[in-house]
Amino acid sequence: MNFNYHFIWSLVILSQISQVQAGFGDPREALAEIQQKHGKPCDCAGGYVSSPPINSLTTVSCSTHTAYSVTNSLKWQCVSTPTTPSNTHIGSCPGECNTISYDSVHASCYNHYQQCNIGNKTYLTATITGDRTPAIGDGNVPTVLGTSHNLITAGCPNGKKGQVVCWNSRPSVHISDGGGPQDKARDIIVNKKFEELHRSLFPELSYHPLALPEARGKEKIDAHTLDLLATVHSLLNASQPSLAEDCWLCLQSGDPVPLALPYNDTLCSNFACLSNHSCPLTPPFLVQPFNFTDSNCLYAHYQNNSFDIDVGLASFTNCSSYYNVSTASKPSNSLCAPNSSVFVCGNNKAYTYLPTNWTGSCVLATLLPDIDIIPGSEPVPIPAIDHFLGKAKRAIQLIPLFVGLGITTAVSTGAAGLGVSITQYTKLSHQLISDVQAISSTIQDLQDQVDSLAEVVLQNRRGLDLLTAEQGGICLALQEKCCFYANKSGIVRDKIKNLQDDLERRRRQLIDNPFWTSFHGFLPYVMPLLGPLLCLLLVLSFGPIIFNKLMTFIKHQIESIQAKPIQVHYHRLEQEDSGGSYLTLT
């Protein structure tokens, strides 16, 4: 009998056991979640701070600001680069600068700077407000003066906080000032030299007056941008079909800043794939290095002449090994990046070609467009009557493209997994390299349309959020992004047009309604106040009645309690032999 009871209870207990998985799950999925939460460097998910964080893992230059990956939160915090007052040149330098001047000062050491002169030489001057120790590279980092002088990032002058100092306006070779005026001057110098090189290799064409290329209208989208979006959607459809069949692809307005991912070293062992044959020559452009840890770097020594092109040092990664182009067994050290890749050098600048006289250190990278994804299930703020009523907008959840394509998982598996994934994105990276300038102008045209239509909206006092091209409809403007709708068949070019038609139909219904257009058009402005006014009116009207009813009920309950008589209960006590009868009161 006991055996039967034990058997029955064992079955009951086993039926209540549920399957669980021990451990912390797939670390690659965790990495993808972390990177989606913290975002891309230039998105500044950690916000803007006045001074650089004390402890950071890496630094990425974003033109107008510098992003720092903070160790305690891993979110990217940004610091705006110093600005120049309206009067940028103050004439002679302060007296303190006549005794000592510095080669370079980091941009985080001051808030504003100006130009001044000492003799016939131009310097930069500012009041030091911060403290920063110069960044020293590893012992094998190639520099101008050898491995014993391996300074790669400038610092603040020691003991000069609160004092005025001066430093050279011309950038120091291979030394970065953290995105300050010297780094900007270096970019200008390099861009000019590449423009001269481009003109010498590709002379400008003179068009016949009757054969000028047709100007692209502002209501049309550039074919390069459409091809890029189509390629992105094709890859997304191959990796996550459920997401690709109903989503929005959002491009950042303004100049594009693509993501730079580590290039698969197995495809270019010891940089044997580099060559000096003809390759597309594009101007240097800014990228966002992503997931760079230990990299194989290549460098060329400084020749100490005026013909050298200083591309800077790749300070965003730790170079585990170096390939010296200067001593390579080649007739020259000019290099072409392998197909679908670029050289990423100092200041996060990307190059498709490095001429013979280049100097600095670079890494190979594959590009990925800076595109965010909005799932179709995510409600986007298409204007409706609730926008006229002042309904608060909901934040849009954006998914970075590298998360949607599963690139973070591939990167975390190492070189082999990355190689398999990056090979699939070769076409996309090559297309992005070729069309980065055209895409920039296209999105800028769209941004101009957004700004122009925004002025019209404000002038007409219409609370429209759908800011698109006036003819045909191009994209949906969301959070300074230009979003294109896509389904399983590809990019839907008439999606915005349909939304516009629906919006116009609803707007006409409101306009034709005499209730909405009464009071000389002031009703749309009064409607957001009607809710609070109605609530206040209800409180003032029914509040006293409810209060009186409540007080009456409480008073009645108190009176009923007081009116109850005190009931006295008697019972006979137990009698003992020697006692008599007693009564007790309870």
Curated annotation (Swiss-Prot):
Coiled coil: 419-469, 479-515
Official protein name in the record: Envelope glycoprotein
Extent of motif CX6CC: 475-483
InterPro entries per UniProt: TLV/ENV_coat_polyprotein
Pfam families: TLV_coat (PF00429)
Segments in the Extracellular topological domain: 23-526
Subunit structure and binding partners: The mature envelope protein (Env) consists of a trimer of SU-TM heterodimers attached by a labile interchain disulfide bond.
Record keywords: Cleavage on pair of basic residues, Coiled coil, Disulfide bond, Fusion of virus membrane with host cell membrane, Fusion of virus membrane with host membrane, Glycoprotein, Host cell membrane, Host membrane, Host-virus interaction, Membrane, Signal, Transmembrane, Transmembrane helix, Viral attachment to host cell, Viral envelope protein, Viral penetration into host cytoplasm, Virion, Virus entry into host cell
Region Immunosuppression: start-end pairs: 458-474
Residues the record marks as carrying a glycan: N120, N237, N264, N276, N291, N304, N318, N324, N339, N357, N487
Signal peptide positions on this chain: 1-22
Motif YXXL motif, residue numbers: 570-573
Record PTM: Specific enzymatic cleavages in vivo yield mature proteins. Envelope glycoproteins are synthesized as an inactive precursor that is N-glycosylated and processed likely by host cell furin or by a furin-like protease in the Golgi to yield the mature SU and TM proteins. The cleavage site between SU and TM requires the minimal sequence [KR]-X-[KR]-R. The R-peptide is released from the C-terminus of the cytoplasmic tail of the TM protein upon particle formation as a result of proteolytic cleavage by the viral protease. Cleavage of this peptide is required for TM to become fusogenic.
PANTHER family with a match to the protein in the record: ENDOGENOUS RETROVIRUS GROUP S71 MEMBER 1 ENV POLYPROTEIN, VIRAL ENVELOPE PROTEIN
Gene source species: Mason-Pfizer monkey virus
Chain positions of site Cleavage: R394, A395, V568, H569
One Gene Ontology cellular component annotation held by this UniProt entry: viral envelope
Residue segments, region Fusion peptide: 398-418
CDD domains linked: HTLV-1-like_HR1-HR2
GO BP, sorted A to Z: fusion of virus membrane with host plasma membrane; symbiont entry into host cell; virion attachment to host cell
